[in-house]
């Protein structure tokens, strides 16, 4: 039987590229998204790409009933699920004193609790099956410490902690868990950006556009990592290098290395 895959935020960006890769392999692919027109168009693309069953179910990951509805539908129609990819997410930036509590609540509800909801409703299905794979899309921002992005960093760090916790918790049930931490790459994350600093938003857009890997390339690295059963999937070598430095170097040395990296990311006019 073909693999059964559900991807949140699957109508565009990284989620769409992941869906297309699985579709080309003949999988049964369901995408959930809040954008219905995009979702329907991507569903058509998945069918043309070779999915044995391509579906779009409107799904807002901040609404418990939406996520539960997807789980119930796929359990009934497909008899379960093999791969859950919690991909839906948004971006936020700004100095700690400038970002409102409402913006903190907004990003936490989507980036963290949206992932929690997916894990919560699909884990019982995986336990009944005795197998399954949860793939949570975090970010290198969850492993490193990018200034003026505290709300985003916190949600992604929490997704990393959730994932590694569940990897240990669910192992005895035959359930695998992977967490993906990409750096900047060419995607549409800027569409969701809430920022108190227009200059920072502009810089982020440039960094995303100048990423060395495309969304399709990142997606392929993820699919390969899932197939290999990796827990941490780090698509960018530069990000992995910084993470190793943070873990193993004295903090003073790591901090100097990281600050230098941050300076290179800034526009020339904003450096020093």
Regions found by a protein language model. Name each.
Residues 95-96, 103-108:
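Substrate-binding pocket helix/loop in short-chain dehydrogenase/reductase
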Residues 139:
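Residue(s) in the substrate-gating loop at a strand-loop-helix junction
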Residues 36-37, 58-69, 101:
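The beta1-alpha1 cofactor-binding region of Rossmann-like NAD(H)/NADP(H)-dependent oxidoreductases
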Residues 1-30:
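Canonical Rossmann dinucleotide-binding motif of NAD(H)/NADP(H)-dependent dehydrogenases/reductases
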Residues 172-237:
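SDR active-site lid
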Residues 119, 155:
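Active-site helix of classical SDR
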Residues 97, 144-150, 154:
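Active-site loop immediately N-terminal to the catalytic Tyr-X3-Lys motif
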């Amino acid at each position: 039987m073909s693999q059964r895959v559900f991807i949140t935020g699957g109508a565009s960006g990284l989620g769409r590229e992941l869906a297309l890769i699985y579709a080309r392999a003949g999988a049964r692919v369901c995408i959930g998204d809040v954008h219905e027109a995009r979702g329907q168009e991507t569903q058509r693309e998945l069918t043309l790409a070779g999915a044995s069953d391509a579906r779009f179910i409107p799904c807002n990951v901040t609404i418990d009933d939406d996520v539960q509805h997807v789980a119930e539908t796929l359990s009934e129609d497909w008899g379960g699920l093999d791969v859950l990819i919690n991909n839906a997410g948004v971006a936020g930036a700004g100095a700690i004193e400038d970002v409102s509590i409402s913006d903190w609540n907004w990003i936490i509800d989507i980036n963290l609790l949206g992932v929690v909801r997916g894990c919560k409703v699909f884990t019982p299905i995986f336990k009944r099956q005795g197998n399954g794979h949860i793939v949570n899309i975090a970010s290198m921002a969850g492993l490193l410490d990018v200034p003026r992005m505290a709300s985003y960093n916190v949600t992604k760090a929490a997704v990393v902690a959730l994932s590694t916790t569940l990897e240990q918790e669910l192992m005895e049930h035959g359930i695998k868990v992977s967490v993906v931490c990409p750096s900047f790459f060419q995607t549409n994350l800027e569409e969701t950006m809430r920022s108190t600093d227009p200059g920072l938003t502009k810089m982020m857009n440039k960094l995303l556009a100048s990423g060395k890997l495309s969304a399709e390339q990142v997606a392929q690295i993820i699919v390969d990592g899932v197939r290999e059963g990796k827990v941490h999937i780090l698509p960018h070598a530069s990000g992995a290098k910084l993470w190793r430095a943070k873990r193993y170097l004295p903090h003073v040395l790591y901090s100097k290395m990281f600050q230098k990296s941050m300076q290179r990311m800034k526009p020339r006019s904003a450096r020093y």
